[in-house]
Amino acid sequence: MIKQRTLKQAAKVTGIGLHSGKKVTLTLRPAPAHTGIIYARTDLDPVVYFPASAESIRDTQLCTCMINDEGVRISTVEHLNAAMSALGLDNLIVEVDAAEIPIMDGSSSPFIYLLLDAGIEEQDAPKKFIRIKESVRVEEGDKWAEFKPYSHGLKLDFTIDFTHPMITKEVRNYKMEFSAQHFIQQLSRARTFTFMKDVEYLQSIGLALGGSLDNAIVLDEYRILNEEGLRFKDELVRHKMLDAVGDLFMCGYNILGDFKAYKSGHSLNNKLLRAVLANENAWEFVTFDDKAEVPQGYQVTEQVFI
């Protein structure tokens, strides 16, 4: 049986909030089977809890942001979410003492190391997957994202299209068969990116105050401003795929299907997830009693826990 997973022990890290520029402490705590992923604002009295769900995402303007009915929010959850998805975590309490998850270096890599350092523990309950049964597609202008059935795991295909001399045709598309190893090696280190003109505007209205060359790739009209350059020649599209992995994990379950997207972002990713879940014929829950039946991308996950 493929079992649910949580952490062996709590883990804590302190970083900077991307928009506030202030110190943020993140604490990840183990949770019992069937708890799911629950975010919590511990700086508020009483503590405000946010169970992960597609519907909890109500702002996707600059990041993926959870907002409850009272207007309380937790921003920039996507990079941590992607790391939890990659490691197959099912049950976790995510405590944060601010309105946003720390940006760290702008990628998922610090969260991967934090989670692995705490240790992954299997629980005595079957792990549920969402399996796509019918094709679902959403569009916004020329942008689109879709899921199609794919029984062998999660297949990812993402294309970006920006007019910039550094973003040539050769680095606009990335494809990957999802697994913990592939995510860690190919996606986790890909950093968020932005354009200098956008940074200047956001900071003028009190946002992105924690943004810097230490936690984002910044481009001007002609070049990349980071002295160290890129971690991958196609780091930008890899990061967009990382974002999509995190956005799609807002349902709290690993998805089995074929995901393709063109110029998609947080808004369209969430729109696709909502469209899938709203169509009862498009998906089903599945568990695997026999490990031999598990899609290949999820058969090898245990290797990264050693």
Swiss-Prot record:
Q: Report which superkingdom the organism of origin falls in.
A: Bacteria
Keyword Lipid biosynthesis found = yes
Q: Where is the signal peptide?
A: none
Which pathway does the UniProt entry assign to this protein? Glycolipid biosynthesis; lipid IV(A) biosynthesis; lipid IV(A) from (3R)-3-hydroxytetradecanoyl-[acyl-carrier-protein] and UDP-N-acetyl-alpha-D-glucosamine: step 2/6
BP terms from Gene Ontology: lipid A biosynthetic process
Cofactors that this protein relies on:
Zn(2+)
Q: Where are the transmembrane segments?
A: none
- Reaction equations catalysed: a UDP-3-O-[(3R)-3-hydroxyacyl]-N-acetyl-alpha-D-glucosamine + H2O = a UDP-3-O-[(3R)-3-hydroxyacyl]-alpha-D-glucosamine + acetate
One term under GO cellular component: membrane
For this protein, the Enzyme Commission number is 3.5.1.108
Residues that bind Zn(2+), according to the entry?
H79, H239, D243
Which residues are annotated as active site? H266 (proton donor)
Glycosyltransferase as UniProt keyword = no
According to the UniProt record, what class of enzyme is this?
hydrolase
Q: Name one GO molecular function term.
A: metal ion binding
Q: Which UniProt keywords apply?
A: Hydrolase, Lipid A biosynthesis, Lipid biosynthesis, Lipid metabolism, Metal-binding, Zinc
> What Pfam families has UniProt attached to this entry?
LpxC
Give the matching InterPro entries: Ribosomal_Su5_D2-typ_SF, UDP-acyl_GlcNac_deAcase, UDP-acyl_GlcNac_deAcase_C, UDP-acyl_N-AcGlcN_deAcase_N
What does the record give as the function of this protein?
Answer: Catalyzes the hydrolysis of UDP-3-O-myristoyl-N-acetylglucosamine to form UDP-3-O-myristoylglucosamine and acetate, the committed step in lipid A biosynthesis.
- Family label: Belongs to the LpxC family.
- Protein name, per record: UDP-3-O-acyl-N-acetylglucosamine deacetylase
**What is the originating organism of this protein?**
Glaesserella parasuis serovar 5 (strain SH0165)
